[in-house]
């Protein structure tokens, strides 16, 4: 059966960016930028994005395009008879584990969009808003409902095919996301007192950077640049398999990285002016999204409207990742079993829903279950993906593309450079072969130490 391809280059770029853009762009990147020295952190982050994220992303795209297979089968296609193929199964497992907790978080975004639009938070003080968040976590049935909507809608889109389902929906959703983002950012920057938030966010503050420690800032930027693109589990390789050979792949990797960075930066333009305008502390993680910002919207004129738009923006950001990863899972399972796309979607839909239940139950009925080092179920699942599968998977991609024991540098470079645009240069070989694996391994070790310390 002939492999279905994406209908346009724009579709490929938006799909790949949609996979990279997620809720971490909104609740982590702006906070890190503000705390780690503003514009100084952004410059260091962009440097690491270019020297770390772009090369590995180029490798994933090249492997997918050359093999014209899912991550499950691409190793067998590129290096027949080798043992590299086992990593394809790890990639599939990584995508599944990622969705075991990400669908729950996407469900939270959807629920907060519905609740904000319905006026649930209107008139509540800080304590009341915090109580609402606690009530959501304590209600497994309601969380399962919203998580189920995310799963069913996601697989329904994927069942329509690459062009008619995935590409069509993602293109419109990503364009809506970008429009919403700019509208929200413009409104936030016009708030009285918002300029102080912009100064805190964007102006380089080397004194603040020195207080935190230059080493800590560099490590933070390096980690964020690596993890923002979701490299290492083949989530990007699948899109390489859906495109032609008109464009060189390093240029495409740069464009996807810049799109991802634009959304991350603009999230800060939404959050910091609003928080500073109303004297609200800016913190990281779920507290920022589910407690701090609903409180801010209660003080803004037409806050219910702007809050609804913000949580719609977040829902789109989460759902774009869900669609991309669902496509990867469906393609892998379909190639492994020979099932039709619709049958695969139906079975995967039921499977992902059931596998996602432990995560949401970990906040109520199973709240005493602490699988890894005393961490709850969501954090434990996140650890398996973010701290193990992403860095180790990226290391495997690098070794496969640069050593004679794998696909090899010459074949990788020939595939990556086919077409017009920015190409992999010969002088990059020593860096990508010897330096890049060391950087990724350092990130892996830092992640392990940090997780078990906390």
Question: What would you call each of these model-derived segments?
Answer:
Residues 5-16, 41-44, 83-96, 145-150, ...:
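Select transmembrane alpha-helical segments in multipass membrane proteins
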Residues 3, 73, 106-138, 242-246, ...:
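Helix-loop-helix connectors at the membrane interface of multi-pass transporters/channels
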Residues 3-4, 32-36, 71-90, 103-163, ...:
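Inter-helical loop and helix-membrane interface segments of multi-pass membrane transporters/permeases
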Residues 11-48, 234-240, 251-254, 258-259, ...:
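Transmembrane helix-boundary motif of multi-pass solute transporters/channels
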Residues 32-36, 83-99, 134-136, 149-173, ...:
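Membrane-water interface regions at transmembrane-helix termini and the short interhelical loops
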Residues 87-90, 338-349, 380-440:
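C-terminal membrane-solvent junction of multi-pass transporters and transport-like membrane proteins
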């Amino acid at each position: 059966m002939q492999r279905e391809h994406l209908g346009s280059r724009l579709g490929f770029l938006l799909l790949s960016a949609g996979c990279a853009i997620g809720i971490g762009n909104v609740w982590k990147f702006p906070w890190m930028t503000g705390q780690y020295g503003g514009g100084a952190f952004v410059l260091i982050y962009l440097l690491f994005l270019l020297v770390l994220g772009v090369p590995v992303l180029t490798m994933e795209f090249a492997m997918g395009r050359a093999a014209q297979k899912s991550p499950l089968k691409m190793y067998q296609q590129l290096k027949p008879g080798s043992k590299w193929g086992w990593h394809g199964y790890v990639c599939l497992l990584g995508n599944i584990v990622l969705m075991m907790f990400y669908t729950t978080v996407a469900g939270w975004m959807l629920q907060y969009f519905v609740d904000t639009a319905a006026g649930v938070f209107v008139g509540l003080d800080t304590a009341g808003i915090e109580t609402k968040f606690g009530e959501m976590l304590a209600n497994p049935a309601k969380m399962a409902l919203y998580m189920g909507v995310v799963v069913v809608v996601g697989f329904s889109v994927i069942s329509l095919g690459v062009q008619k389902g995935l590409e069509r929906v993602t293109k419109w959703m990503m364009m809506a996301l970008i429009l919403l983002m700019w509208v929200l950012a413009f409104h936030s920057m016009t708030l009285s007192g918002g300029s102080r938030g912009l100064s805190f966010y964007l102006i380089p503050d080397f004194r603040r950077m020195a207080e935190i420690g230059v080493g800590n800032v560099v490590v933070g930027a390096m980690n964020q640049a690596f993890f923002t693109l979701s490299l290492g589990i083949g989530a990007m390789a699948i899109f390489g398999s859906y495109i032609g050979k008109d464009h060189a792949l390093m240029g495409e990797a740069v464009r996807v990285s810049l799109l991802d960075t634009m959304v991350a930066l603009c999230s800060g333009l939404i959050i910091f002016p609003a928080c500073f305008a109303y004297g609200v502390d800016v913190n990281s993680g779920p507290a920022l999204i589910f407690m701090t910002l609903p409180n801010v919207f209660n003080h803004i004129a037409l806050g219910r409207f702007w809050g609804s738009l913000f949580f719609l923006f977040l829902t789109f950001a989460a759902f774009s990742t869900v669609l991309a990863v669902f496509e990867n899972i469906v393609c892998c399972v379909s190639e492994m079993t020979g099932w039709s796309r619709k049958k695969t979607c139906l079975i995967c839909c039921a499977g992902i829903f059931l596998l996602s239940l432990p995560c949401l139950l970990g906040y109520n009925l199973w709240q005493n279950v602490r699988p890894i080092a005393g961490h709850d179920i969501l954090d434990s699942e996140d650890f398996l993906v973010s701290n193990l599968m992403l860095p180790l998977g990226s290391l495997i991609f690098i070794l496969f593309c640069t050593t004679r024991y794998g696909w090899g540098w010459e074949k990788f470079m020939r595939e990556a450079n086919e077409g017009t645009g920015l190409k992999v240069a010969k002088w990059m070989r020593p860096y990508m072969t010897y330096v890049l694996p060391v950087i990724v391994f350092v990130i892996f070790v830092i992640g392990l130490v940090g997780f078990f310390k906390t």
